Regions:
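Short, hydrophobic/amphipathic alpha-helical patches that form generic packing surfaces
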Residues: 6-14, 158-167, 208-212, 290-291, ...
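Signature of N6-adenine DNA methyltransferases within the class I
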Residues: 9-11, 18-69, 73, 80-100, ...
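Class I S-adenosyl-L-methionine
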Residues: 76-172, 181, 251-411, 429, ...
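Conserved hydrophobic/aromatic pocket- or pore-lining residues that grip, position, or stack substrates
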Residues: 288, 312, 377, 433, ...
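Flexible, glycine/threonine-enriched loop-and-boundary segments that flank and lead into catalytic domains
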Residues: 137-148, 270-271, 350-370, 413, ...
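Class I S-adenosyl-L-methionine-dependent methyltransferase module
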Residues: 78, 173, 365-368, 372, ...
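Polybasic, glycine- and aromatic-enriched phosphate-binding surface used to engage nucleic acids
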Residues: 1-64, 242-247, 251-252, 270, ...
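Non-catalytic DNA-recognition/assembly elements of restriction-modification systems
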Residues: 147, 376, 519, 560, ...
Length: 1010
């Protein structure tokens, strides 16, 4: 492959392998550097994209893609096809989306048939709507529970797609006397095609196949006319589906299912980062899970692209190995050698000598590693680590010239048993994760072997709730030591047990739980009366989520994990409090990081640090907002106390997920000397290019911050030349917090549609405005409303105007807002009172009835911003592309929550005009871009905590103040006459004065204005 790509950026190559042949497109690219805006000579590693053709392979996708290339060339005879055209023709991501779209449509057809309901997307939310009456089977089989029906359909489809991979190996319906790879690769479709009564295909054909054939240990016997594999492990266990034996499902949906699946190639191999087969692979199961759950994004779950999974797994494994013998692995030769072993790159002579000398030690470390994903989802991260550990072991064994004592499948099985653990609160996630591990073993088997039982490897539980917060109670209980050893033995034996042995071991486990309870009950009453009652709740053999998680009781891991890795849920506490107030209360009680309006991922970091070993590593992909947001204070303090901030790779505005979530890869390791910070420095079109960026990172390309300098205060993280400029600015002694007494958010009414009136027209002492709540115009007294600004009304230097008002049930006395009494409104403002009464029930019902208070039901939800609005101030929208500050000289305007007001401290000599110029300057915008929080489209949030840290010189020369003020006055004058007036010259002069104030040099100014 290297030889092919030495001279060209792209090549089409055919590789022939017997009756199969691979048609590959191999490409490499040069990289555009975002900072310098130039194309760098550094090329990416070559990548191969392959269609598999030949006997038993599908060609529809390839034919459609190649035809598109032909048509494009026909339409543009004088334009050559570009690399982008070829990459589109060989796009794996495109195939994944196509397949998932078809799969989801089939899923929805089945669900709609049973429930009469279908999920549709309204805005960013999935909403269930009734299409038609529910089928009688919803009542008869599913107890009128739509979720039961949805879960059944997911399991059924999951089993079918799993069997598509199995039949690809030739393991279904193997004729008597034939080898295991000579089964029918079209078995499922032919089973349906030949079915006499297709309406009963599920009950008459799939039920026997799933639960009587594939779950039968005798089905593999040679004397059977047709042999099938015995797929134990729980995938075809009937426990959850015993009620549905007679279920009838429409034949036309099955027909659509099989015709769709038959259009795609299924491959049993999961690709390496630089190898891509354009086919449906086992990883697709993860994609299906992460996207199929209609409320998954509401749960904060997002599917992680495999390029990121590969990188995180390799880096975590490297970090783990380096920590095993810090003296041995301290020098650069050791680090480089380990990196190349994990990357499977060619070693030079010195590296090879190191690897050969230390092979046993490295293999031993690889066999002992303990890995946990605390929110396992589809199992992508543990699956990735399984593959990396396997690859590294094989690499070292081949280097030493060892003969393999075990098959690939046996090696993987051993890794799963000794190293892999996962937890998820969602039973569906646990099912899919287990399924992926089974598939990873099936891939490498030449003949079917019993699958391991993963009940004690991947559990359904709430990771965030510990069994007990008193660590001393859990392991030292008089008389319980022998029982605990017995439990460990059951756990070990269960992994490889047969169907009959499983039942016996399950009984043993439950008996031992009860025995433990009886042994410890007297001790328990005096220590923790609930502890062992909670223990009995854990039943790994059911798909019911346990309300707590403990690595020792569930996995036998007492001293912590070496690697905790994953993609934790992103959920704000407000959403959790609405859906599960009990959990919200528990989190705030248990975790220091659960402060303010926290997001769930910060709690996952704290929990991960509790369950990782002292020298272990936590590696998550998650938002970086915690570094500079108020809610991150608790987590920042924890990391500061432990010196645990190790590495952050921030992706900026590049959206790794199909959501407005801005993330980074983040490593946490106790007792780290410094935090390495990297920031995406190039424009990316795809996750492939993201992979190239990650591979290009070197220690010298980051910025390093001593952990001793990181506190609970906001972290200002910048990279490259940017870091030097920010460091220089930060030498200034004052901050915006020293200048402004109040930076306040606008009105929080908790029912804007009632309080805000639109398109207002003066009518003497009254105003006529449109009420969205009543969907009509209403008349109201002028004295009962205030002018209202929304974010869209505020632009840089503009003369502020608005045709909106806010209904304002407060009177201002001595600068304080006091709520009118109901009788006062009734007598003084009868029009306003009539309007409020018309909306009374809505206002009383706000926030679950919190305002159902006589004489106060019309008050705002919060009093923020009420007392300060009628003062001279600056105003700015919360979200903005560049500075958009304006001047409310007379303090006329109130605003929504999306506009902030700025009021100076007494004694600050610089006028509002000067600060208006500074806030609208390029330097201030640059500071926000480098230290703030990016949103879609390059917009940034101008919330208080991002503004306050801006550095301010101790003394600002009078001539600078005067010059900026005069220039701002000129701009405001021009804007009064026409908002379209050109003000570029004045703005440039203001920028130059600000640069001079901060002593910025030509190269620094060029960096800021780039």
């Amino acid at each position: 492959m290297k030889d092919i790509t030495k001279q060209v950026a792209g090549a089409m190559v055919v590789f022939v392998q017997g009756d199969k042949w691979r048609f590959s497109y191999i490409s490499k690219r040069k990289v555009k550097n975002k900072e310098t805006n130039t194309i760098e000579d550094k090329e990416t590693a070559p990548k191969r994209y392959t269609y598999l053709f030949g006997k038993g392979e599908k060609a529809l996708t390839a034919a459609q893609r190649f035809d598109k290339l032909i048509q494009k060339q026909k339409d543009n005879l004088f334009d050559l096809l570009s690399l982008d055209d070829f990459e589109d023709a060989f796009s794996v991501e495109k195939l994944s989306k196509e397949f998932f779209k078809s799969y989801k449509e089939i899923y929805e057809h089945f669900v709609e048939f049973i429930t009469g309901k279908r999920y549709v997307k309204k805005g960013s939310k999935w909403t269930e709507i009734q299409i038609h009456e529910a089928h009688f089977q919803l009542r008869n089989y599913f107890d009128n529970d739509s979720k039961q029906a949805r879960d059944f359909v997911k399991r059924m489809l999951g089993r079918i797609v799993f069997l598509y991979f199995i039949q690809k190996k030739g393991w279904l319906a193997v004729p008597k006397g034939k080898k295991w790879d000579e089964g029918n690769p079209e078995y499922l479709f032919e089973l349906f095609k030949n079915a006499k009564y297709k309406e009963s295909f599920y009950s008459d054909y799939l039920v026997p196949l799933f639960f009587e054939t594939l779950n039968n240990p005798n089905v593999q016997k040679e004397n059977n006319e047709l042999r099938f594999p015995y797929l134990n492990g729980g995938l075809f266990d009937k426990t959850q589906d015993y009620k549905y034996d007679k279920l009838a499902l429409p034949s036309e949906i099955f027909e659509k299912l099989f015709s769709t699946f038959n259009n795609y190639n299924f491959t049993i191999y999961e690709d390496a980062p630089d190898e891509h087969t354009i086919a449906v692979d086992p990883e697709m199961l993860g994609h299906i899970f992460e996207n199929l759950l209609e409320d998954n994004k509401d749960k904060g779950a997002f599917y992680t692209p495999k390029e990121i999974v590969h990188y995180m797994c390799k880096e975590s494994l490297k970090t783990y190995l380096l920590a095993q013998d810090e003296k041995l692995f301290a020098d650069e030769l050791a680090k480089t050698s380990l990196e190349k072993i994990i990357q499977q790159q060619e070693l030079n002579e010195d590296e090879k000598a190191f690897a050969e000398k230390n092979a046993y030690r490295i293999i031993d470390a690889l066999e002992k590693v303990k890995i946990c994903d605390p929110a396992i989802g589809s199992g992508a991260f543990p699956m990735g680590l399984l593959q990396e550990i396997f690859n590294a072991q094989i690499y070292l064994q081949e280097l030493k010239g060892f003969k393999k004592a075990k098959s690939d499948a046996d090696i993987k099985k051993h890794i799963i048993e000794e190293s892999i653990y996962g937890v998820d609160v969602d039973a569906g996630a646990v099912d899919i994760a287990r399924l992926r591990f089974w598939l990873s073993l099936v891939v490498d088997e030449e003949v079917p072997q019993p699958l391991p039982n993963l009940a004690f490897k991947i559990v359904c539980a709430n990771t965030l709730i510990p069994l007990s917060t008193d660590k001393s109670n859990q392991y030292q209980i008089a008389g319980a030591t022998d029982i605990i050893k017995e439990i460990e033995k059951v756990r070990h034996n269960y992994f490889d047990s047969s169907k009959e042995e499983k039942k016996d071991l399950e009984r043993q486990f439950k008996n031992l739980q009860n025995k433990l309870w009886n042994t410890a009950k007297d001790w328990v009453i005096s220590k923790d009366a609930d502890l062992y009652q909670r223990l009995l709740e854990f039943n790994p053999f059911e798909d019911k989520s346990c309300s707590w998680f403990d690595p020792w009781w569930m996995f036998g891991v007492k001293d912590g994990f070496d690697i905790v890795i994953g993609n934790p849920p992103y959920l704000r506490i407000q959403g959790i409090r609405d859906s599960n107030p009990k959990l919200a209360d528990a989190l705030t009680k248990i975790y220091k990081s659960a402060s303010g309006s926290f997001d769930l991922y910060v709690v996952f970091v704290e929990r991960a640090l509790q369950i990782v070993k002292a020298n272990g590593v936590v590696n998550f992909i998650m938002p970086t907002k915690w570094t500079n947001a108020a809610f991150g204070k608790g987590l920042r303090q924890i990391l500061s106390d432990k010196n645990a901030a190790n590495k952050i790779i921030y992706f900026g505005a590049y959206q790794v997920f199909d959501a407005s979530t801005y993330t980074g890869i983040q490593f946490f390791k106790a007792n780290s000397d410094e935090l390495s910070y990297y920031e995406l420095d190039r424009d990316l079109k795809s996750n492939d290019e993201l992979s190239d960026y990650l591979q290009s990172l070197t220690p010298i390309s980051g910025t390093f911050i001593a952990n001793s300098k990181l506190t609970s205060d906001i972290w200002t993280l910048t990279a490259g030349g940017t870091s030097k400029i920010i460091d220089k600015l930060n030498l200034q002694p004052r901050r915006i917090s020293d200048i402004f007494e109040k930076i306040f958010q606008g009105l929080a009414t908790s029912k804007d549609d009632v309080y805000f009136l639109y398109d207002c027209v003066d009518e003497g002492d009254d105003i006529i405005g449109f009420s969205k709540q009543l969907n009509k115009s209403i008349k109201i007294e002028r004295g009962f409303v205030k002018p209202l600004l929304k974010g869209e009304d505020v632009h840089r230097y503009d003369n502020i105007t608005s045709n909106r008002v806010v209904v304002f049930p407060y009177k201002l006395e001595n600068g304080n807002a006091e709520l009118y009494k109901e009788d006062e409104i009734k007598n003084q403002f009868p029009l306003a009172y009539a309007y409020l009464k018309e909306c009374e029930s809505i206002l009383r019902d706000r926030e679950k009835g919190r305002f159902n208070i006589d004489d106060e039901w019309f008050q705002f939800g919060r009093k923020q911003g009420i007392n300060f609005a009628e003062k001279e101030k600056l105003v700015a929208p919360e979200i903005s592309l560049g500075g958009n500050f304006a001047y409310d000289k007379n303090g006329r305007f109130y605003s929504t929550t999306k506009v902030y007001g700025y009021i100076k401290k007494d004694g600050v000599k610089e006028s509002y005009l000067f600060w208006l110029g500074l806030f609208n300057s390029k330097l201030f915008w640059y500071f926000i871009q480098q230290t703030g929080y990016v949103l879609r489209g390059g917009y940034f949030t101008f919330k208080t905590n991002y503004i306050l840290p801006f550095p301010v010189p101790k003394i600002i020369p009078t001539e600078t103040i005067s010059a900026v003020e005069e220039l701002v006055k000129k701009i405001l004058k021009k804007k009064e006459n026409s908002y379209r007036k050109n003000i570029l010259n004045e703005e440039k002069e203001i920028d130059n004065f600000i640069y001079k104030l901060y002593d910025l040099k030509t190269d620094e100014i060029s960096e800021i204005e780039r």
